Design a protein with these regions (language model features):
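Short alpha-helical donor nucleotide-sugar binding micro-motif in glycosyltransferases
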Residues: 232-237
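Short hydrophobic beta-strand element within catalytic cores of glycosyltransferases
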Residues: 263-266
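Nucleotide-activated donor-binding/catalytic signature segment of Leloir-type glycosyltransferases, i.e.
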Residues: 206-225
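A short, active-site helix/loop in glycosyltransferases that binds the activated sugar's phosphate group
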Residues: 103-107, 112-136, 144-146
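Glycosyltransferase donor-sugar binding loop
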Residues: 41-45, 165, 192-206, 223
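A charged, aromatic-enriched C-terminal amphipathic alpha-helix characteristic of glycosyltransferases
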Residues: 18, 60, 300-330
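Conserved acidic donor-binding segment of nucleotide-sugar-dependent glycosyltransferases
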Residues: 280-289, 296-302
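A conserved mid-protein helix/loop that constitutes part of the nucleotide-sugar donor-binding site
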Residues: 21-25, 160, 169-183
Length: 331
């Protein structure tokens, strides 16, 4: 049994970030292989996110001390509870490094544990922050669920279909995108821009969604909360925008889009450059002019060919990610 212990605080909700997508995908693949796996939450009861992931086993614990009785291997997600485990535990670090004030606490989280990061960039940053050798970290790269690679592409459209599917949070570059959409060239080039209203589980996402309610320069579409719907959306898009203004540890959405045959224009920052499957265009972050240029370059390249998509699908595969996880856990 491999138990992924969700961190204290929020429940595991679909459509709220890469940590959720990554964890759910790992559990599904482990189960497919006949390896028992589950998501464990503390203090949420049945409101722990299981509604969003009906195909994944959830175990709701009342107290953190109950983690000590979990059989098999415990994998803490992002933050660890201060409890002993039957076997050596692991911690997987999806998030960015926090402020220096949290260094001692984060060092305590990794004590006597297998430490996993989700990109080379992220691993380097965490090694520096935690003051540990980079060689101590195991890199278990993210992936695209196979459904993204098998999603049927929509027929070509006269207008280029541009999609922003990140959360409506400032760090995801939503304000950079809005500045781009107000540029005259974007209003006259005939592209069709859609913005997914994801990230409304927190106040800032709700605020930005309300602000965009009557926005004239893009179509607002509801968030997709499962891989099938997300794969369909990407397969009906030509260019995905990821104008992040902070150094993301990786960027699973970039990989998913490329597997779906969608070109990606993303900020050249953090782990995003590592997501290149052959359909990625990198641009300077916080620079609307650079983002417009990147969009123009991606559009000029045209729709991805069947060969380009097949080559993209050979990168960041789910089975390879789970193989790396099992090696890191010595299983």
């Amino acid at each position: 049994m491999i138990s992924f212990v969700w961190p204290p605080g929020a429940a595991m909700l679909a459509g709220t970030g890469g940590s959720e997508t990554y964890t759910a995908g790992q559990v599904r693949e482990l189960l497919r292989r006949g390896i028992q796996a589950q998501v464990v939450t503390v203090g949420h009861g049945t409101k722990d996110g299981r509604k969003d992931f009906p195909d994944i086993p959830f175990l709701a614990l009342n107290n953190a001390s109950d983690i000590s009785r979990l059989p098999g291997t415990v994998v803490f997600v992002n933050r660890a509870y201060d409890v002993p485990t039957i076997n050596k535990a692991a911690i997987i670090l999806h998030c960015i490094t926090p402020g220096v004030a949290q260094r001692k606490q984060r060092q305590a989280y990794i004590a006597d544990k297998i430490v996993i990061a989700t990109s080379i960039y992220s691993g380097q940053q965490w090694a520096l922050f935690l003051n540990i050798p980079y060689s101590r970290l195991h890199i278990v790269l993210p992936f695209a669920d196979p459904i993204f690679g098998s999603a049927k592409r929509a027929k070509p459209s006269k207008k280029t279909r541009i999609l922003y599917a990140g959360r409506l949070h400032p760090e995801k570059g939503i304000y950079t995108l809005l500045e781009v959409l107000h540029a005259e060239v974007m209003r006259k080039n005939g592209h069709r821009v859609s913005i997914v209203t994801a990230g409304q589980h927190v106040e800032e996402g709700q605020t930005i969604a309300q602000m965009l309610r009557d926005y004239p320069y893009a179509q607002l579409i509801p968030a997709r909360n499962n891989v099938t719907d997300m794969a369909t959306l990407l397969a009906h898009s030509d260019v995905l925008l990821m104008p992040s203004v902070f150094a993301e540890p990786f960027g699973m959405l970039s990989v998913e889009a490329q597997h779906a045959g969608c070109r990606v224009v993303a900020s050249n920052i953090g782990g995003l450059p590592e997501t290149n499957c052959g359909l990625l265009t990198l641009v300077e972050p916080r620079n609307p002019r650079a983002l417009i240029t990147g969009i123009e370059q991606a559009v000029a390249l045209g729709a991805a060919t069947k060969k380009e998509r097949e080559e993209a699908k050979d990168n960041f595969m789910l089975d390879e990610s789970v193989n790396s996880l099992l090696m890191a856990l010595h299983l």
